């Protein structure tokens, strides 16, 4: 699977980082809370990075 098709994944850890993931259903980059370790590659620090990688102009 392409990383943009993966679901958001909180991962492991006790941190609460706000990150962005591409939601294939809505076609948008949305926020989720990341635990700080693990997870998957559909995890971006900024909305801009998510849009550039996955949303192809829909942001």
Swiss-Prot record:
Protein name per its UniProtKB record: Kunitz-type serine protease inhibitor LmKTT-1c
Cellular compartments per GO CC: extracellular region; extracellular space; host cell membrane
Site (Interacts directly with the S1 pocket of trypsin): 14
Function: Serine protease inhibitor that inhibits trypsin at a molar ratio of 1:1 (Ki=124 nM).
Organism (species): Lychas mucronatus (Chinese swimming scorpion)
Localization per Swiss-Prot or TrEMBL: Secreted
Disulphide connectivity of cysteines: 4-54, 29-50, 51-59
UniProt-listed PANTHER family: BPTI_KUNITZ INHIBITOR DOMAIN-CONTAINING PROTEIN, KUNITZ-TYPE PROTEASE INHIBITOR-RELATED
Tissue: Expressed by the venom gland.
GO term, biological process aspect, one: envenomation resulting in negative regulation of voltage-gated potassium channel activity in another organism
Sorted UniProt keywords: Disulfide bond, Ion channel impairing toxin, Potassium channel impairing toxin, Protease inhibitor, Secreted, Serine protease inhibitor, Toxin, Voltage-gated potassium channel impairing toxin
Domain BPTI/Kunitz inhibitor: 4-54
Xref: InterPro entries: Kunitz_BPTI (IPR002223), Kunitz_BPTI_sf (IPR036880), TFPI/VKTCI-like (IPR050098)
UniProt miscellaneous comment: Negative results: has no effect on chymotrypsin and elastase. Shows weak inhibitory activity against mKv1.3/KCNA3 potassium channel (inhibits 50% of currents at 1 uM).
Lineage: superkingdom: Eukaryota
SUPFAM superfamilies: BPTI-like
Primary site of residence: secreted
A GO term for molecular function: potassium channel regulator activity
Protein family (similarity comment): Belongs to the venom Kunitz-type family. Scorpion delta-Ktx subfamily. Delta-Ktx 2 sub-subfamily.
